[in-house]
Amino acid sequence: MAAAAGGGTREEMVYMAKLAEQAERYEEMVEFMEKVVTAAAAGGGGELTVEERNLLSVAYKNVIGARRASWRIVSSIEQKEEGRGAAGHAAAARSYRARVEAELSNICAGILRLLDERLVPAAAAVDAKVFYLKMKGDYHRYLAEFKTGAERKDAADATLAAYQAAQDIAMKELSPTHPIRLGLALNFSVFYYEILNSPDRACTLAKQAFDEAISELDTLGEESYKDSTLIMQLLRDNLTLWTSDMQDDGGDEMRDATKPEDEH
């Protein structure tokens, strides 16, 4: 058993991460999984198992998800206060939003550093490469959600580059029904709709992914059936939402791969 930095073996850190998940202590879950990544690198090769990478994804998604929800709420309150001319309250909300944004930036920086320095370079399996490149795109997209000006453009450019690199591999190497390929298409299409304001491109991408998966539904293995069909449902829901009203940005109704991936 390889010993993880900070005490405990890699296997023990995985167990502790699962405990933290059950206890909904996601910041600690992140810490345990970061130790697993360090232990994997120290053990040579640096690849995580499928279970480990899913635990890492769940940990970070919950930590970032709480702050993304907070940011949306505080931003909405700030706009309402500005709208009714309550300058003092609006300033307080703006200051509080900046605090949440600092936390969002730090969380994204942490996982992006892990991805760039450890996880993407060590990924040998095709599904792992696509998984980590998609994850890289996701966290740059989360930055693009609240950054402004040149920082927003940089985050959007980095998101596009990561998703495109993932898609180039996925289209060649993964079946249309593979849950990672479908999850990538889902999040890539949300990026086009929400960040790049390209509803036509978003709909085209989502529809193509859905149609290709439908045509090969009979090839779906039992182990990935639930994940794949759940993401297909989200793709279809988004298509319905986007095509029903292209003028509406979808707001809180927007769906990405958070739900299906959280169920791994």
From Swiss-Prot:
SMART domains: 14_3_3. InterPro entries: 14-3-3, 14-3-3_CS, 14-3-3_dom_sf, 14-3-3_domain. It comes from the Eukaryota. Residues 245-264 are annotated as: Disordered. GO terms for cellular component: cytoplasm. Disulfide bonds: none annotated. Residues 252-264 have a biased composition (Basic and acidic residues). It holds the Pfam family 14-3-3. GO terms for biological process: protein localization; signal transduction. Belongs to the 14-3-3 family. Is associated with a DNA binding complex that binds to the G box, a well-characterized cis-acting DNA regulatory element found in plant genes. This is 14-3-3-like protein GF14-A. It comes from Oryza sativa subsp. japonica (Rice). The lineage of its organism: Eukaryota, Viridiplantae, Streptophyta, Embryophyta, Tracheophyta.
